[in-house]
Amino acid sequence: MAKEELLEMRGKVVELLPNAMFRVELENGHEVLGHTAGKMRKNRIRVLVGDEVLCELTPYDLTKARITYRFMPGRGGPGQGPGPQ
């Protein structure tokens, strides 16, 4: 599957589940089951309940997602430069 086919959506972590899984509520109100991407695991980026995250979904299964970015309060997202100072 090519990367162009992935859907990126913003969401909020609402529940921590076993085996490094998370229940994420997307901007549109849908809830998906998410897991952290390998680079986030490798760099030990913690994801907690209430965190704003960026998820990648495949058009073939819209119930599962990969968490690729955790938004920091007061900072911009990926590719947005520094936040307010």
UniProtKB/Swiss-Prot annotation:
Record field: transmembrane: none
NCBIfam families documented for this protein: infA (TIGR00008)
SUPFAM superfamilies reported for this sequence: Nucleic acid-binding proteins
Domain S1-like: 1-72
UniProtKB keywords: Cytoplasm, Initiation factor, Protein biosynthesis, RNA-binding, rRNA-binding
Protein function: One of the essential components for the initiation of protein synthesis. Stabilizes the binding of IF-2 and IF-3 on the 30S subunit to which N-formylmethionyl-tRNA(fMet) subsequently binds. Helps modulate mRNA selection, yielding the 30S pre-initiation complex (PIC). Upon addition of the 50S ribosomal subunit IF-1, IF-2 and IF-3 are released leaving the mature 70S translation initiation complex.
GO cellular component: cytosol
Classification via Pfam families: eIF-1a
InterPro entries for the chain: NA-bd_OB-fold, RNA-binding_domain_S1_IF1, S1_domain, TIF_IF1
Family as reported in the entry's similarity comment: Belongs to the IF-1 family.
Naturally occurring in which organism (per UniProt): Erythrobacter litoralis (strain HTCC2594)
Signal peptide: none
Domain of life: Bacteria
Entry protein name: Translation initiation factor IF-1
GO molecular function: ribosome binding; rRNA binding; translation initiation factor activity
Subcellular compartments: Cytoplasm
Main location: cytoplasm
UniProt subunit comment: Component of the 30S ribosomal translation pre-initiation complex which assembles on the 30S ribosome in the order IF-2 and IF-3, IF-1 and N-formylmethionyl-tRNA(fMet); mRNA recruitment can occur at any time during PIC assembly.
